[in-house]
Amino acid sequence: MAGRGSRLRPHTLTVPKPLIPIAGKPIVQRLVEDIAKVAGEKIDEIAFIIGDFGEEVEQSLIEIAEKLGAKGSIYTQDEPLGTAHAIKCAENSMQGDVVIAFADTLFRADFVLDKVSDGVIWVKKVEDPSAFGVVKLDDYGFITDFVEKPQTFVSDLAIIGIYYFKSAEKLMDEINFIMNNNIKQGGEYQLTTALENLRQKGA
């Protein structure tokens, strides 16, 4: 949630993009409600990673979590240093199995959560994959490669911004590794780098 939302201006000059209402509800509220439905169990905590949006926005997000019977936690990403860096900001909430969702993506979370796997990434075919992180799959549907915003075509399966991890701790180990070793793509710490490391280790 820490981005500036420039593509939705002028609306985002006064309201952060995830809080813009769609059919009467903020985007982020619809997203967490959908995820709560497919999780199939009570959600203990919803952590929001935001920019400097102010106390009113923070309180709105906490109320969204509380409506679902969950604790709401707020973390601030002071600099836009990438998706992995954003998750690092919420490290204190990263325990056990987790769902990570990018709240500024306009889609409905209509899927089945398969908790048998170590991790699940939801993808969608797109016409212009150069604007997204994409995955390459083998014949069995398993991921063979992650590519962040490819400039030449490698796949049209874009990562839509929802992930499930059975072990948040394993993910954090990889995020800490890439940050401690200053491994960047496009000047930022990318989640896809951590995911590729996990894939190579058989996760």
Give the location of each predicted region.
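Short, charged, surface-exposed secondary-structure boundary motifs
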Residues: 83-85, 129-134, 155-157
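Conserved N-terminal catalytic core of the sugar/cofactor nucleotidyltransferase
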Residues: 7, 13, 20-21, 25-101, ...
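Residue-level signal for inorganic ion chemistry
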Residues: 28, 90, 104, 125, ...
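Conserved donor-nucleotide/metal-binding helix-loop-beta segment in metal-dependent transferases, i.e.
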Residues: 108-134
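Short beta-strand/turn micro-motifs composed of small residues
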Residues: 1, 50, 102, 123-124
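Short N-terminal binding/cap micro-motifs at the start of the first secondary-structure element
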Residues: 5-10, 130
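Active-site metal-binding loops of divalent metal-dependent hydrolases
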Residues: 4, 104-105
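Catalytic-core segments of class I nucleotidyltransferases/pyrophosphorylases
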Residues: 142-203
